[in-house]
Every structure is written in structure tokens, then in C-alpha cells.
Curated annotation (Swiss-Prot):
Belongs to the universal ribosomal protein uS15 family. The keyword Nucleus does not apply. One of the primary rRNA binding proteins, it binds directly to 16S rRNA where it helps nucleate assembly of the platform of the 30S subunit by binding and bridging several RNA helices of the 16S rRNA. This is Small ribosomal subunit protein uS15. Part of the 30S ribosomal subunit. Forms a bridge to the 50S subunit in the 70S ribosome, contacting the 23S rRNA. Keywords: Ribonucleoprotein, Ribosomal protein, RNA-binding, rRNA-binding. The keyword Secreted does not apply. GO terms for biological process: translation. One of its GO terms (cellular component) is cytosolic small ribosomal subunit. One of its GO terms (molecular function) is rRNA binding. It holds the Pfam family Ribosomal_S15.
Length: 88
């Protein structure tokens, strides 16, 4: 699970203005951190299939947010994927 302090760091790094907690960039960054955490979890717990389903839901949610951002503003989309390093 994502610690509150870590979540606050992510929000601070990706926010667009002072009270921003829900912009697509912030949401994508938080989802990416959770996906990374679960990926490491599965390296140890290979048979945790219930959590694997949750991981797939998170990946799908992030994909939808990225598609939304790409449709709205391509420059912001490219900036986010470059900062997070989620596309090759």
C-alpha cells in the first residue's frame, strides 16, 4: 500500500497548482507508484492471484487516464510519460 508521505511527495511533484490533487498527471503518477509496488510484491509472492487482478485493474485505469490526457493535450501526455518513464 502507498504510504501517505509517499503520496504527498508524488502530489507535490506533479501538481499543477497549490490545491491540485486530482489532475490526470497526479492520478497517473499515483497509479504508477502503486503499480510499481505491486510488481515488486509479485516477484516475492508469485501465487497471489487476487492481488494480480487488482494490478490489472490499476493498469487499465492508468491506461484510460493516459488516453484521456492524450486526447485533451498531447504535450501534457508526452511530459507525463517522459517523467514517469512508462513508455519506451
Amino acid at each position: 500500500m502507498l504510504a501517505t508521505e509517499k503520496k504527498q511527495e508524488i502530489i507535490k511533484a506533479f501538481k499543477k497548482h497549490d490545491s491540485d490533487t486530482g489532475s490526470p498527471e497526479v492520478q497517473i503518477a499515483i497509479l504508477t507508484e502503486r503499480i510499481t509496488y505491486l510488481t515488486e510484491h509479485f516477484k516475492v509472492h508469485k501465487k497471489d492471484h487476487h492481488s494480480r487482478r487488482g494490478l490489472l485493474k490499476l493498469v487499465g485505469q492508468r491506461r484510460r487516464l493516459l488516453d484521456y490526457l492524450k486526447g485533451k493535450e498531447v504535450a501534457r501526455y508526452k511530459a507525463v510519460i517522459e517523467r514517469l518513464g512508462i513508455r519506451r
